[in-house]
């Protein structure tokens, strides 16, 4: 794996978004691109207007052989209570270490919600055994905004037996299929409650995002604070339920 391979993953994600009607929109307040003040590093971010979603963001960080990052979070419209899509891929080139986290991030931890939205992710979890890492994400409460079937790889890239590109492609396909998992017994969460759950998610994530320290080391604290609060989790300034 190298910089070009991670860029290919980004390009595949972009094609998927466009194929579902996505159109790029302007990233404001100087958040679209930032060069490191002390290292040969750049971070770029994009926003997409995608039918059925209120916000879809993508970020790429390029620090050469030291580090490559691809991150994306997609928030469905408030009228849809399906999970938030989360993608986090980090490649530490000098160590040849890969950390990849792919999940349908649940708005609530309830059995009926899991039955409604997680059948396809469960199938992927069973198929791709490499993504059953037992290493936990210590910063986060895994029972809060991660599903029981989060796809997690944390280890040497050389030990990965399956194609990361294939996993990401099937993961995205599965996410777009969740609306087809109809259940007559399932009663959707009302839009006003979904909005509050999105706010809670942003507040929780902004307070615990481990990437903040990374951004701070490369781009300085002032910009890192602004990036996390205004671009990554813009609802974090609102009031939690």
UniProtKB/Swiss-Prot annotation:
Keywords: Oxidoreductase. Transmembrane segments: none annotated. It comes from the Bacteria. One of its GO terms (molecular function) is 15,16-dihydrobiliverdin:ferredoxin oxidoreductase activity. This is 15,16-dihydrobiliverdin:ferredoxin oxidoreductase. Belongs to the HY2 family. The lineage of its organism: Bacteria, Bacillati, Cyanobacteriota, Cyanophyceae, Synechococcales. Gene3D superfamilies: 3.40.1500.20.
């Amino acid at each position: 794996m190298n910089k070009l391979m991670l860029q290919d993953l980004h390009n595949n994600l972009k094609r998927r978004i466009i194929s579902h009607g996505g159109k790029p929109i302007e990233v404001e307040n100087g958040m679209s691109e930032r060069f490191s003040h002390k290292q040969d590093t750049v971070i770029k971010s994009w926003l997409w207007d995608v039918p059925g979603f209120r916000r879809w963001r993508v970020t790429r960080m390029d620090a050469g052989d030291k580090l490559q990052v691809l991150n994306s979070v997609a928030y469905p419209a408030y009228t849809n209570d399906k999970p938030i899509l989360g993608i986090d891929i980090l490649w530490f080139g000098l160590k040849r270490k890969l950390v990849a986290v792919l999940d349908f991030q649940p708005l609530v931890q309830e059995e009926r919600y899991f039955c409604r939205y997680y059948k396809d992710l469960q199938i992927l979890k069973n198929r791709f055994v490499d993504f059953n890492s037992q290493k936990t994400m210590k910063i986060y409460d895994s029972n809060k905004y991660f599903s029981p079937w989060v796809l997690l790889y944390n280890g040497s890239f050389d030990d990965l037996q399956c194609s990361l590109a294939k996993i990401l492609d099937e993961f995205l396909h599965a996410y777009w299929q969740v609306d087809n998992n109809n259940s007559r017994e399932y009663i959707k969460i009302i839009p006003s409650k979904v909005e509050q759950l999105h706010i809670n998610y942003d507040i929780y994530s902004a307070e615990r995002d481990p990437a903040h320290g990374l951004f701070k080391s490369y781009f300085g604290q002032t910009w890192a604070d602004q990036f996390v609060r205004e671009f990554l989790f813009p609802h974090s300034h609102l009031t939690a339920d």
